[in-house]
Every structure is written in C-alpha cells, then in structure tokens.
From Swiss-Prot:
The lineage of its organism: Bacteria, Pseudomonadati, Pseudomonadota, Gammaproteobacteria, Vibrionales. Keywords: Cell outer membrane, Membrane, Signal. It comes from Vibrio cholerae serotype O1 (strain ATCC 39315 / El Tor Inaba N16961). The gene is tcpF. The keyword Plastid does not apply. Involved in TCP pilus biogenesis. May be a channel protein. This is Toxin coregulated pilus biosynthesis protein F. The keyword Disulfide bond does not apply.
Amino acid sequence: MRYKKTLMLSIMITSFNSFAFNDNYSSTSTVYATSNEATDSRGSEHLRYPYLECIKIGMSRDYLENCVKVSFPTSQDMFYDAYPSTESDGAKTRTKEDFSARLLAGDYDSLQKLYIDFYLAQTTFDWEIPTRDQIETLVNYANEGKLSTALNQEYITGRFLTKENGRYDIVNVGGVPDNTPVKLPAIVSKRGLMGTTSVVNAIPNEIYPHIKVYEGTLSRLKPGGAMIAVLEYDVNELSKHGYTNLWDVQFKVLVGVPHAETGVIYDPVYEETVKPYQPSNNLTGKKLYNVSTNDMHNGYKWSNTMFSNSNYKTQILLTKGDGSGVKLYSKAYSENFK
C-alpha cells in the first residue's frame, strides 16, 4: 500500500502475536558490537553487543529475545561509541547531537549514509530504518514492556521516521500534532550477520543453570570413547523458553573454546547433532534426556577432537526437533564434566 510523505497513523494496540516482521527482518540475527571486541570493526567478526549490554540499558531478562530484534537505542552513548574515530585529532564526528540535527532537518539520506549504512562498517549491511509494520510491532513491544527501559518510553507516542522500498515516510503514533519532532529511537536488524555468528540466544553468565548431569556410571566424558550425558531439565524452565512438546527436541554436541563472557562455544571446531534417548523414569517436574556421541561409528571424531587441545571443552545445545527455538546451552565441560 502506497502512502503519503507524512502518514497520519494511529496505531491500534493489539496482541503481541498478531504482528510479525517482514521476511528480511531477522528474528535469529545476533546483536550489536562490543567496543572491546571490535576496536577495528571492519576486521572483526564480533560485530554486536551481547545480551549483557541489553541488560545494562534496562532490558528485562524475561524478554531478552527482543534484544535480537532491535539495535541499541540511538540515544545511548554506546551506540555512537561503536563508530571508529575518523578525524586525525581523534574527535568523534558521529554524535547524538549530529544525529539529532540531521534527523530534525529531514536530512535522511546523510543520516542513512553516516549512521546506518556505516554502522560498524559491515560489508553486508545489516541495519535499517524500521518499516511502518516494524514500528507497529515495536509499539506493541513497548506497551507490553518488552523493550529496554528507554525504548519502552520512546515508542508509546510520537512521529517516527520509517523507510520502505527506498522511500522515507513519517508515521504518527498516538494522535500527536504534526509539528511534533520526528524520532528514530533505534535502527533495526534486517538480515543475518555476515560471517560467524558471535552472539546467539544465550544469556551471559546464566546459560541455563538448571541442568543436572548424572555423573558416575550413567555419564561419561573421557578420552577414547563416546561422550554420554544423562541430563535433567526443569520442566517449568523448558516451558518458559517455549518447549511445550518435550519429545520434539534435538541436541548438538559442540567442541571448542567457550567465549570468555558468555561461556558459549560460538565457533565449534566440531559439532554433532544427536537425537536423545528419553527414559521414562522422570521425576515430577523434571525431564531426563540421554545424549551420546556416535564415536564408535565415526572413528571417534568427538573424542579425537575434544582431547586434541587442552583449551577445548564440550557443550550441549538443546533446540526443538527442527533446530528452531530458543537455544539452551549447558555449561561447557572439560574431562569428567568438570
């Protein structure tokens, strides 16, 4: 549907599930770049802020999945700190004041070029000004308190810059006057990250802490044989993360070096997808899964890889049977599940 340069739109707030982002809006995209990981953002594969940064700016832990859908608020200093300095004297040319001035002046092309196309100097552009549908979804998020503290306030009412098919338009939310200043509270992710995905759906320092490993004769993590792990999950925790059909799951066994902050093995040197054996003797409120690698039939690939480097650890990732769903990670284990 075509609409005017200034679109008077009073968005009706309906249920969260009734809206979805378009096909180019990646719900699995990872988030943000950390300045300490991406000093030279052009050469780094660690291009985005991890979930910990979302928590720092007021994102509720209950809605961290929305952290993969919205970039840092443009009012935050960390948004501008991600840009490298471009002046010989080290002065920052991309600032909140400059951003606001271009936005209020209607200089959208330069705003796009300097702050969005260039964001973190990605060779595959991943960020964009939201579309009208995305603004509508963000308004729904905000009214349900599912964004950061800053964005929950920003999206309640206002006039928002949108872009669709190369065309800029203004969307009015909440019946605000036409002379209300235009806002662009956040840019959004429109596709997956180039190269490796360095940050995924895991909460730093809180990577599914309710997994119990039955050690001893039931579980085994030693050289020269298959890894066997009997894992106990809390059913309420699984349900909280969208796992209602506890039989429709799969596991990946990952080997590599865990990330220093999150403990997640983002770039495994070995991975193996396995279907678990599900014993029937579950305790009330608990779910047991028996996960094992296929070493005896594939030349001990897991064992040979795991114990080829003293820095390597093994981590077990739970997803839904088709690989979708929130990614639930175990601790990364060394020998004997230590």
